[in-house]
Amino acid sequence: MDMKFYKCSHCGNIIAYVNASGVKASCCGEEMTEIVPKTADSSTEKHVPVVKVDGNLVTVTVGSTLHPMEEKHSIQWISLQTEQGNQRKALAPGQEPTAVFALAPGDKVVAAYEYCNLHGLWKA
């Protein structure tokens, strides 16, 4: 099952459901909006995560050409969905748009997500 992310249109909070019970997510007194990840990238700045697995280590890099990591335009986080759960790494301007995750024995990658402060949610 794909992860689902929701964003508050007032304060910008973003949540991901661990277990969706059917109750709508709300924030600031209103229902949150589901963020549908993009999967194709035609812009000059690449957003689609690139996933490389080496044994139990998974490296996720944002873009086949590295995404900028400036104050005004950067990747805020990278999330890895696996068969056994998910992991998230926060990023900051000035860092490389890359995160390394460790898989538990027998676990496998399902999807990788990243969130750009200007262009939203992306998935590979």
Predicted regions and their residues:
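Short acidic/polar inter-strand loop motif in beta-rich domains
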Residues: 115-124
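Cys/His-rich microdomains that often coordinate metals
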Residues: 15, 31-32, 120
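Short Cys/His-rich "knuckle" micro-motifs
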Residues: 17-21, 35-38, 124
